[in-house]
């Protein structure tokens, strides 16, 4: 069954609502330039209230390694998502399983995938202005081609109206959504989250 991650969680209300809808993982953005930014202490307070068996993911962009590892410990992160230009060596020093994000413009964007020995590869649309959460899509054929390298988490422009099509086309390990289920940056829409999870899992 396709896993679902709801990213950009900033409130306990949204976290519990996403879990109730059937989300497998929640993402917390520790990148201060993001409109979905949350501080480690605030995230930790939310995470402590979550039910068991929900995966907790922390998103970082070219952060100091010590900050990543300290935040992972403070929050009890299950997985670290690296969304910048982090090297394979850097990934190897993170004290959690790593999901490395690649911002896809074309096949050349994925040339470095084999260099990264990580738990999963997140494929997102390229934007010169933002590291994720843009609502932009990329050609899913690139995701299909990348599946031979390992687990693929599909992101970029997904929403309740197209996620079933994406799952049918790519058959990814998981799908990741942020802006596609929002009322405003950092606040989720209950009905969109419910529909997204249901649509993502209906073909499984």
UniProtKB/Swiss-Prot annotation:
EC number(s) stated in the UniProt entry for this protein: 5.3.1.24
Keyword Amino-acid biosynthesis: yes
The keyword Isomerase is assigned to this record: yes
Pathway: Amino-acid biosynthesis; L-tryptophan biosynthesis; L-tryptophan from chorismate: step 3/5
GO biological process: one example: L-tryptophan biosynthetic process
PANTHER family on file: N-(5'-PHOSPHORIBOSYL)ANTHRANILATE ISOMERASE
Alphabetical list of NCBIfam families matching this protein: PRK01222.1-4
Protein name, UniProt field: N-(5'-phosphoribosyl)anthranilate isomerase
